[in-house]
Regions:
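N-terminal Rossmann-like dinucleotide/flavin-binding domain of flavoprotein oxidoreductases
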Residues: 44-103
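Glycine/Thr-rich phosphate-binding loops of Rossmann-like dinucleotide-binding domains
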Residues: 40-41, 119-120, 159-161
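N-terminal glycine-rich anion-binding loops that anchor highly charged ligand groups
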Residues: 32-45
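Short amphipathic alpha-helical segments
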Residues: 20-21, 44-45, 121-124
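Glycine-rich beta-alpha-beta "Rossmann" dinucleotide-binding loop(s) and their flanking helix/strand
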Residues: 100, 109, 113-136
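Core beta-strand elements of the Rossmann-like FAD/NAD(P) dinucleotide-binding domain
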Residues: 3-5, 98-108
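Rossmann-like dinucleotide/flavin-binding elements
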Residues: 2-4, 9-35, 129, 135-161
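Extreme N-terminal leader/targeting segments of oxidoreductases
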Residues: 1-7, 66, 74-75, 120, ...
Length: 161
């Protein structure tokens, strides 16, 4: 059973990288699939992150994620720049297939793919993303205090945030 890994992590945002660090420190020899296009998750598209502990004056999203990636590398987690395209999570041994057609087996799988926002197709929506158009009320609500805003989509969670 030497080709069966202890743990495979899918996703390379803060949760995926944190899982990889802890798994590596526990000597589980994790494999982390960081994606084929943009590793680092949604924070790679974020400017200043002011609510992450340890950065009193804030930190740029890409800088934070690069620092986390270096920490993952330091603990010798195996980082694969590819997407997982299919999974069979039934049974004791899980099987994952990546975009290159490689299959990896593991006893445990951590899914840390994060979330994705949905654009609604307004003119200039992409251009104004991060400059008035926001995708995270919890993250960005602070910047819009005492202003008139519109909340679109998200079901109950949009109003709760």
């Amino acid at each position: 059973m030497s080709d069966v890994n202890e743990v495979v992590i899918v996703g390379s945002g803060p949760a995926g990288y944190t899982a990889a660090i802890y798994a590596a420190r526990a000597q589980l020899k994790p494999i982390i699939y960081e994606g084929s296009v943009t590793a680092g998750g949604a924070l790679m598209n974020t400017t200043e992150v002011e609510n992450f502990p340890g950065f009193a004056t804030g930190v740029m999203g890409p800088e934070l994620m690069e620092s986390m990636r270096k920490q993952v590398e330091r603990f010798d987690a195996k980082i694969i720049t590819d997407d997982i395209v299919s999974m069979n999570l039934t049974g004791e041994i899980k099987e994952l297939t990546d975009g290159s057609g490689n299959t990896v087996k593991a006893k445990s799988v951590i899914l840390a793919m994060g979330s994705a926002y949905k654009e609604i197709g307004l003119p200039n929506e992409k251009r104004l993303s991060g400059r008035g158009v926001s995708w995270c009320a919890t993250c960005d609500g602070f910047f819009f205090r005492e202003q008139v805003i519109a909340v679109v989509g998200g079901g109950d969670s949009a109003m709760e945030e």
